[in-house]
């Protein structure tokens, strides 16, 4: 039977070499550099210790940028809906006033309320688009 090199490694050496693998990411980045102890170095062991780093390639950055623009474009569709809603509200105001001029004040107050609701939704959609573009 063949024995592999992994079975011949002492437990202390294995613990010292895999210490970086079991630490949380925040502890790996925020801790101070460790003082070397009297344990044997890991360089003689054929184990490859994985380093936890945030790496972004050009392709992943391009995908993130494209996703930002697609999300912001989808959020601005609501602004067009807001414009259509405001047009509908004031069109209905004109039609209602033409049918019954005595209700001018009540129709106008309802039209202003409808305008405010549609305008708020449009501004909310625009705010979400800007948040997607500049805050993420």
UniProtKB/Swiss-Prot annotation:
UniProt xrefs under Pfam families: ATP-synt_C
Bilayer topology annotation: Multi-pass membrane protein
SUPFAM superfamilies linked: F1F0 ATP synthase subunit C (SSF81333)
Residues marked Reversibly protonated during proton transport (site): 119
Related illness: This protein is the major protein stored in the storage bodies of animals or humans affected with ceroid lipofuscinosis (Batten disease).
Keywords: CF(0), Hydrogen ion transport, Ion transport, Lipid-binding, Membrane, Methylation, Mitochondrion, Transit peptide, Transmembrane, Transmembrane helix, Transport
Name this protein carries in UniProt: ATP synthase F(0) complex subunit C1, mitochondrial
Positions where N6,N6,N6-trimethyllysine occurs in the chain: 104
GO CC list: mitochondrial membrane; proton-transporting ATP synthase complex; proton-transporting two-sector ATPase complex, proton-transporting domain
Subunit structure: Homooctamer; the c-ring consists of eight c subunits forming a circle, and each subunit adopts a hairpin shape. Component of the ATP synthase complex composed at least of ATP5F1A/subunit alpha, ATP5F1B/subunit beta, ATP5MC1/subunit c (homooctomer), MT-ATP6/subunit a, MT-ATP8/subunit 8, ATP5ME/subunit e, ATP5MF/subunit f, ATP5MG/subunit g, ATP5MK/subunit k, ATP5MJ/subunit j, ATP5F1C/subunit gamma, ATP5F1D/subunit delta, ATP5F1E/subunit epsilon, ATP5PF/subunit F6, ATP5PB/subunit b, ATP5PD/subunit d, ATP5PO/subunit OSCP.
Segments traversing the membrane: 77-97, 112-132
Gene Ontology BP annotations: proton motive force-driven ATP synthesis; proton transmembrane transport
Free-text description of this protein's post-translational modifications in UniProt: Trimethylated by ATPSCKMT at Lys-104. Methylation is required for proper incorporation of the C subunit into the ATP synthase complex and mitochondrial respiration.
Additional detail: There are three genes which encode the ATP synthase proteolipid and they specify precursors with different import sequences but identical mature proteins.
Role summary: Subunit c, of the mitochondrial membrane ATP synthase complex (F(1)F(0) ATP synthase or Complex V) that produces ATP from ADP in the presence of a proton gradient across the membrane which is generated by electron transport complexes of the respiratory chain. ATP synthase complex consist of a soluble F(1) head domain - the catalytic core - and a membrane F(1) domain - the membrane proton channel. These two domains are linked by a central stalk rotating inside the F(1) region and a stationary peripheral stalk.
Record-linked Gene3D superfamilies: F1F0 ATP synthase subunit C
């Amino acid at each position: 039977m063949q024995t592999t090199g992994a079975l011949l490694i002492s437990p202390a050496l294995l613990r010292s070499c895999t210490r970086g693998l079991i630490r949380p990411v925040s502890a790996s980045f925020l801790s101070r550099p460790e003082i070397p102890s009297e344990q044997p170095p890991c360089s003689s062991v054929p184990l490859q210790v994985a380093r936890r780093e945030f790496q972004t390639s050009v392709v992943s950055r391009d995908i993130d940028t494209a996703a930002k623009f697609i999300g912001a474009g989808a959020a601005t569709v609501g602004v067009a809906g807001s414009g259509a809603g405001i047009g509908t509200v004031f069109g209905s105001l004109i039609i209602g006033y033409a049918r019954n001029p005595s209700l001018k004040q009540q129709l106008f107050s309802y039209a202003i309320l409808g305008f405010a609701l549609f305008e708020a939704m449009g501004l909310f959609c625009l705010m979400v688009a800007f948040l997607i573009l500049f805050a993420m």
